[in-house]
Amino acid sequence: MRAANLTISIPYLGCDKNCPYCVSKMTGYPKPNSGKLRRNIDKTKTLARAAQVTNVMITGKGEPTLNWNTLLDIIERFQEWPVELQTNGLLLAKHLDKVNTLAVYGLDVVAISIDKIEQFNDFKDLFKRIQDVGMTSRVTLNVTKMIPRTATFNYFISICKQHNIDQFLLRNIVAPTHAQVSEYTEWIKENTSQAHYDKLVGEMNVCLDKFGLFLRETEFGMKIYDYRGVSITRSDYCIQDSSTVNNLRSLILMDDGHVYTNWYSKASRLF
């Protein structure tokens, strides 16, 4: 059994952003157990090595930076791998000194989720601080009706260049396959447009065909390019639940301290 990555869900201590397309609100919250999570870290590392994991992604059912001490502990204990943090960026933008702390503990990539154009400017000092401490910044642009259709792919790349953003991910917002109908799935249905996402992808493909440099392709089909000095890719389906017979998308160390191979299946628990 091989796994593309190890994903660690920091035990939930709330969220400071109320995203109407929040995946966690559609898939539920396991009961957090920080003690069990810490006790299972060594086992998880052994499994990750055996599965030839190449990177660690830290995320959360809430905002991981709100559980600050646990976050730092996890980063420090997994720093033998490249470590990425997925965050809404709000806490870090208010307390830029925390970016320095993350770097000291061994974080490599800060991936910031954005769903409004003005957030690029709101986070300009955060992007600069990430660059100053030598970490890599990524913007994940969540494509909904909150993003104007008039905004082009090249427009977003120009913003990335302006703010020294290293990586740009275009993300299609869809409801998880196994999610029950709720106000959140209905919001996605009413406030996303496949045509809007396809328009940006079409513009991206034209730019990449003319001036892009293909860099690599991940095991699960994400193609990564260099365009104007920015790393470019896209995610057509935003949930990491696809696996093959021999290769897992992720090993998942969940809030409850157990390791799973699927976000939605309790039966996928390994230990």
Language-model region placement:
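Canonical Radical SAM [4Fe-4S] cluster-binding loop centered on the CxxxCxxC motif
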Residues: 1-40
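Radical SAM/AdoMet-radical enzyme domain recognition
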Residues: 44-58, 67-160, 166, 170
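Residue-level recognition of short loop/turn positions
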Residues: 61, 88, 256-257
